[in-house]
Amino acid sequence: STDRGVRTVSAIVLAAAVMLRVIQSVRLNATTQDTLVRNALTDSLTGLPNRILMLEHIEKAIQSSWKTTQRPTVLFIDVDRFKSINDSLGHSTGDAILTEVARRLSNAISPQATVARIAGDEFVVLDSTTESPTQSVVLAERILDALRDPMKGNGGDMFVTASIGVAYAVPTLRLSAEDLMQHADTAMYRAKSAGR
C-alpha cells in the first residue's frame, strides 16, 4: 500500500513535470512564431513594415475609405543616386543613410500615416486621412523638406535627395492596394525622369 502510494505520487509528480515542460514548449513556440511573423512583415534594417505589410495597410485603408470623405494617398519614394553612395562609400554608410531616411520619413508623417521600406532604397508612405489630391502634394513636399538637411556620412555631411510619386485613391476607380502602389511607383519614375 505504501509502495502503491509512492508510485502514485511519483506518477503525479512526473505528470506535472511533463505538463510544465509542455506548457513551456507551447510558450516558446508562441514566442518563436511571433518573432517569425514579425520578421516576415518588417524590414530588418529599419524596423519598418515591409511591402507585404504595407499592401495589407493600403488594402484596409481603401476598404475603410468608402465610408468616409478621407481617401488613401500612397507616396512612392526613391532615394536618388543611392547606388553610387553605396558603391563609393560602402554598405555600412548606405545602411546608415537608409536608417536615417526611415527616421526622417517617420517623423515627417502624421501619427495616422505609415511608412514602409519595400526594397533597397525604396520607401512607401500611406496616409489614409487625405481629403484631396492637394493634401497629398503637401505631404510629398513635407517629406522632401525632411530629407533636405544633410546626413552624416563617413566623410562628412551628405546631401540626399529623393524622387516621389503620388497616387490618390479616387473612389470611382476602385483600385486595389497593388494598383495604387503601382500608380505611385509610375509617378515616381516620371518625377525622376523629369529631373529629380
Where are these regions (language model features)?
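Cyclic nucleotide signaling catalytic output domains
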Residues: V115, R142, G156, S163-T172, ...
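Amphipathic HAMP/coiled-coil signal-transducing linker helices
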Residues: T31-P49, Q63
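Interfacial "cap-and-anchor" motif at the non-cytosolic start of specific transmembrane alpha-helices
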Residues: S1-D34
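PAS/GAF-family sensory domains
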Residues: N29-T32, L36, M54, F76, ...
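Short, well-ordered beta-strand segments
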Residues: L75, V124, G165-A167
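Conserved long alpha-helical elements within nucleotide-processing catalytic cores of c-di-GMP signaling
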Residues: G47-T73, D80-S110, A116-V125, E131-E141, ...
